[in-house]
């Protein structure tokens, strides 16, 4: 059985036992998070939500809170002596999917 959930403005296909990385969510390591925005549940019988499947939830456990590798952003304008270098590290949350309840 699998499901498609919406979190952090993205849609992610998940299965039980899978590890996923999502945009940072509030919670400590070991906390259980429940996703109510389930768009689709597949398996023996498929359920399509309009826009969400009623009564369907996905539970996940927080494994890690972290930050991605640094990206370097560099801007410049020719002939104007304008140079700007900036770094960015996107925060993320690593989750393990416990169960899909449909």
Swiss-Prot record:
InterPro entries: bL21-like (IPR028909), bL21-like_sf (IPR036164), Ribosomal_bL21 (IPR001787), Ribosomal_bL21_CS (IPR018258). Belongs to the bacterial ribosomal protein bL21 family. Part of the 50S ribosomal subunit. Contacts protein L20. The gene is rplU. This is Large ribosomal subunit protein bL21. It comes from Listeria monocytogenes serotype 4b (strain CLIP80459). PANTHER family: 50S RIBOSOMAL PROTEIN L21, LARGE RIBOSOMAL SUBUNIT PROTEIN BL21M. It holds the Pfam family Ribosomal_L21p. This protein binds to 23S rRNA in the presence of protein L20. GO terms for molecular function: rRNA binding; structural constituent of ribosome. Keywords: Ribonucleoprotein, Ribosomal protein, RNA-binding, rRNA-binding. The keyword Transmembrane does not apply. One of its GO terms (biological process) is translation.
